[in-house]
Amino acid sequence: QVHQLFDTNRGIAKALRSNATTVENTDDPNDRLTAINSDGFSLGDDGNPNNGSNTYVCWQWKANGGTTSSNSDGDITSTVQANTTAGFSIVTYTGNGTDGNTVGHGLSGNWDVCILKNRGQTDYWTVSQTGTNQVMLLHDGSGGYEANHSTAYMTKASGVIGLVNAGDLGMVNGSSETYVAYVFKEIQGYSKFGSYIGNGSSDGPFVYTGFKPAFVIYRRNDAGGNWRLLDNK
């Protein structure tokens, strides 16, 4: 199955696949996502998001309603849509190849989850989050999912994402390469990010969030494994 991501920073005709390492794909705008509306979105006739015999699930986050701004908080100027109330931003930038440089994300303070992809190369999706002290791969390109990836990673500082090269700079900051990052910051009573230890029992651990969650995503972080997504729909 194809898992597709669209956003208004990159343009709605440009698709990335979260379950593959393929490059950003630009189709005829009449094929897939054709419009972002005030109360939803419109689809074209492409069989991936709109096959007449299939049922689909989709999740949406509002950033800044499609209005971007230039952000110079980091060493690299980024284009940002940020929703500080919801703790979510979309960041696009062009890498400069300098190890340790930073890029602004538009949310105050430190981020909690950052999902980042090189748009023009078949580099891995890179994921870092609070509570793991690790970088995990959304997809490793071979059908598997890897934990403890250390060839490139992101660090936290107030207002910026640190882009560190430990052997594969193209994943996060290759010279003249284009990137997108989806950045989340925890908002009390609305979102929660962290880790827990399983016990292998049918009476599993209670994971405190402080609210009734509508959407949960989890995966094992000490070994390879699949990401699992649950929602109330």
Predicted feature locations:
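Surface-exposed molecular-recognition determinants
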Residues: 1-233
